[in-house]
Amino acid sequence: MAKKKRTRGPKKEKRIVPVGVAHINSTFNNTIVTITDPEGNVLTWGSGGTAGFKGTKKGTPFAAQLAAEMAAKKAISEYGMKKVDVLVKGPGPGRETAIRALQAAGLEISLIKDVTPIPHNGCRPPRRRRV
């Protein structure tokens, strides 16, 4: 039997998104940087794990820096991004480092906003550690 020749569909065109939103979710265990378009559709992302770190090293500021750099470089090269609004969530050690890394990678930061959820006396927090 002769093999059927597969026809490819039209290639996906490159979108140019000059302005985006960088969401930085920084916990004590990891930092996740997600870059979206203004509507909230994810374009690219990076985390301490995708930067090559495992275990407790994912929560370090250096891991956050590499994660933000990776996400920013991809956003610049693939989508032509120039400006970002930064929304930071969480209490982790990688917050400031990730913002600095976005700026160092060549993105212009127009806004930094803290969107950390604060309970109005909600769930009981975890107990204090005794080391």
From Swiss-Prot:
One CC-aspect GO term: cytosolic small ribosomal subunit
Lineage, highest ranks first: Bacteria, Pseudomonadati, Dictyoglomota, Dictyoglomia, Dictyoglomales
PROSITE patterns to which the protein is assigned, alphabetical: RIBOSOMAL_S11
Protein name: Small ribosomal subunit protein uS11
InterPro entries the record matches: Ribosomal_uS11 (IPR001971), Ribosomal_uS11_bac-type (IPR019981), Ribosomal_uS11_CS (IPR018102), Ribosomal_uS11_sf (IPR036967)
Family annotation (Gene3D superfamilies): Ribosomal protein S11 (3.30.420.80)
Family label: Belongs to the universal ribosomal protein uS11 family.
Subunit details: Part of the 30S ribosomal subunit. Interacts with proteins S7 and S18. Binds to IF-3.
UniProt entry keywords in alphabetical sequence: Ribonucleoprotein, Ribosomal protein, RNA-binding, rRNA-binding
GO molecular function: rRNA binding; structural constituent of ribosome
An annotated GO BP: translation
SUPFAM superfamilies found in the cross-reference section: Translational machinery components
Role played: Located on the platform of the 30S subunit, it bridges several disparate RNA helices of the 16S rRNA. Forms part of the Shine-Dalgarno cleft in the 70S ribosome.
